[in-house]
Amino acid sequence: MGNNKYIEYELTSDILCIGERVKKGTFKPCVKTIPFSSITGSLRDAFNMPNLYALGKFDPDYLDSIEQFRQVHIYSPRYVFEDVAKVPLQIEFLTEVKAQVYIFLTGEAPESFIEKKENREFDITMGAFKSKGFGRCHLSFVRIIENPEINTGRLLSRIPENYMSYFGIRRVIKPVYGYLFEPTSKVSGKYIRALFEGSLIEGYDFLVKEEINK
């Protein structure tokens, strides 16, 4: 696990909507991180690489001032046959997004991946309302991370339990659990248990916010 290498990218997006999983209610809040499920799915679609795994986090300065970038979109879904509007939904989204994304590859060295010019800077779409222009993201290569340090702190992303070792999570001290969607085919999937942001863990420094008072 200590020999893993990661490709770090800077991600920017003018408008992004990654909503919380809420069963009921008319208000759908957005998440405050870049979950494993969202970014991994988008990158696999872009590169057609099932051996690619990724997660992300918002830039610390962006996260500190995130309230000024929150906005709400009013969406009125319609019944297909009756053409009658359902109860309007309030969908929260973010503007001027700045984040970091970390890619882990199995079966290919990061160095060979970024040798290709098209892999150093590219666009993807991610999240909800892509057909309305949401979710266009630009990624720029920053560096390859080798031998990251192990720190104890609060997790800054969301990752399924069965992929924790890919991103250096050695110990879960105080978990915050939730569920992320995992596709099982092009038309179906399932929800699997995941560690959410705020979990107290021992893991790689780029994924944790260190505790001041341990």
What do these predicted ranges mean?
Residues 1-214:
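Conserved active-site/ligand-binding neighborhood in enzyme cores
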